[in-house]
Structure formats: C-alpha cells, structure tokens
Amino acid sequence: MKKRFWFLAGVVSVVLAIQVKNAVFIDYKVEGVSMNPTFQEGNELLVNKFSHRFKTIHRFDIVLFKGPDHKVLIKRVIGLPGETIKYKDDQLYVNGKQVAEPFLKHLKSVSAGSHVTGDFSLKDVTGTSKVPKGKYFVVGDNRIYSFDSRHFGPIREKNIVGVISDAE
C-alpha cells in the first residue's frame, strides 16, 4: 500500500512539475540564421513567458514574439516606443544620437568592409517617424538574412511572449 502511494505521489508530482513548467516557460528552438552569431540555428532556449510583464523591455533585449503569420520569432529590440530610428553608414541612430551595438562587433569584423546593416530610416520602412506607443522595432543580429520590423513594421507589445535580457 505504501509503495503504491509513493508511486502515485511521484507520478502526480512529475505531471504537476511539467504543467507548471509549460505554464511559465516557452521552449523555443532557433530556426534559421537571422540571429547569428548570438544564437545559432538549432539552439534550444527556455524562456520565461511572464518576465516582461513585471519589468521594462530595454533596447537590445532579445524578444520572442508572434510574427505576422503567428509563428513565434526571435529578434533584438532596437527601437522603443516614441523613438526615431535610422541607420546610416552601418551606424544606428536613435533620436538622432549614435548608439553602439557591441553584439555586432564580430559580424562587422568579418564583413570585410561591407555594411552589416543597410541604410534606412523608420519613416522609410514604416511611413511613420516614431515607433508607436505600445510597439517595438526589432531586427535580427544577422541583418542581411533577417525578416524583421524592416519588413513587417514594429511589433505590438501584446505579441511578445518572452524576453531574454542581456544576451550578447
């Protein structure tokens, strides 16, 4: 009788642990090369679904979000609500001020003088001069191979399903 009780208690504990894990975390497998070199295709991530609800999303946080086709994508935040965004000569400008992107150092070193990010402004790609309230402008680290806000516009905060802070 005791063995059966402990066996059932163990099974219930495992089932509950799996349910809690699935309720709190999202398993994400990186597909494609748009986040190279930060994340490689096939990397598996366990991301807290609720962390962004209790803290502010910052520039350069990496977010998981529901993309235009409702598929979960991974990209880096470069534009926050109310900001202007521009790239010129491979440099990011936010509200007219140059902002360093240390996570691109490796890509820039191997690009042999060619630009990692093509020139554009937020107005060029979205028709608006500022990132709208409640939205974020996101791009992949491997800019040449990334389908991101330059193509589908800023993402809605409500479509963010998880945040990875301080990833470089």
Curated annotation (Swiss-Prot):
Cytoplasmic side: 1-6
Transmembrane segments: 7-26
Entry's induction text: Expressed constitutively.
Catalytically driven reaction(s): Cleavage of hydrophobic, N-terminal signal or leader sequences from secreted and periplasmic proteins
Locations listed in the record: Cell membrane
Active-site residue numbers: 34, 75
EC number: 3.4.21.89
Keywords: Cell membrane, Hydrolase, Membrane, Protease, Transmembrane, Transmembrane helix
SUPFAM superfamilies: LexA/Signal peptidase (SSF51306)
Domain of life: Bacteria
Family: Belongs to the peptidase S26 family.
UniProt miscellaneous comment: B.subtilis contains five chromosomal type I signal peptidases: SipS, SipT, SipU, SipV and SipW. They have different, but overlapping, substrate specificities and have different transcription patterns.
Name of protein: Signal peptidase I V
Organism the protein comes from: Bacillus subtilis (strain 168)
Gene: sipV
